[in-house]
Regions:
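Nucleotide-activated donor-binding/catalytic signature segment of Leloir-type glycosyltransferases, i.e.
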Residues: 44-76, 83
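Aromatic "clamp/platform" in nucleotide-sugar-dependent glycosyltransferases that forms part
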Residues: 89
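Short glycine/serine-rich donor-binding loops of glycosyltransferases
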Residues: 94-97, 112
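Short acidic alpha-helix that forms the nucleotide-activated donor recognition element
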Residues: 69-81, 98, 102, 116
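Short hydrophobic beta-strand element within catalytic cores of glycosyltransferases
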Residues: 106-109, 119, 123-127
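Conserved donor-binding/catalytic core segment of Leloir-type glycosyltransferases
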Residues: 1-11, 17-20, 32-33, 148
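C-terminal "capping" alpha-helix adjacent to the active site of nucleotide-linked donor transferases
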Residues: 131-175
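Glycosyltransferase donor-sugar binding loop
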Residues: 29-47
């Protein structure tokens, strides 16, 4: 599994990782690679965030990757996984997820926001969005600012895990997402 996008509240990264670890943590048949480094934060802030997500637990099947400074490195990352996760609750498009599906990767994608312009039941395992919450995190989203306002969809953890299990089954049948190549 590949988790993509710079770390932000609206992307539900923390909730995705915690739900994934609850179901698949230390099950070495599965691996979660997190390319969620946020270049707008200091390296130590990224490290603190990643540590806070998993707490004191030790997992053998998760890694947090640092910033990839070339498209070639990022492309290698996208090609290294069989399943991409796009669970953002406020996405304009989801370019890494879209690229991954176009590369023939299976995908677990929230059926909401900008994803709806390209993600279908045929090319992705669509998951339900959760409720809606205010977006404000006082880092990137400040109440009353002239931009980045509103609400985002939270993660429905049960739907997310169902989507992951469906993607695993699709991957077992054919490692290449033939519908993603269309």
């Amino acid at each position: 599994f590949n988790l993509v996008g710079k770390f932000e509240k609206r992307k539900n990264h923390k909730e995705v990782i915690q739900a994934w670890l609850k179901r698949f943590g230390n099950d070495n048949r599965y691996f979660l690679q997190c390319s969620i480094h946020n270049t707008f934060l200091k390296p130590e802030e990224n490290s603190q965030i990643f540590s806070s997500i998993i707490g004191n637990q030790r997992y053998s099947n998760i890694t947090f990757l640092t910033f990839m400074d070339t498209n070639a490195k990022y492309n290698d990352f996208l090609n290294s996984g069989d399943i991409v996760i796009g669970a953002s609750g406020g996405e304009g498009w989801g370019l890494p997820e879209f690229h991954s599906v176009g590369l023939g990767k299976h995908a677990v994608i929230t059926d909401a926001t900008g994803y709806k312009s390209w993600a279908t039941d045929e090319n992705c395992c669509l998951i339900k969005a959760g409720g809606k919450e205010e977006i404000y995190d006082n880092v990137f989203f400040h109440k009353g600012a002239p931009y980045n306002q509103g609400r985002y969809h939270t993660l429905d953890a049960d739907s997310f895990i169902d989507g992951c299990e469906k993607a695993i089954e699709r991957c077992r049948k054919d490692r290449v997402n033939q519908n993603g190549l269309k």
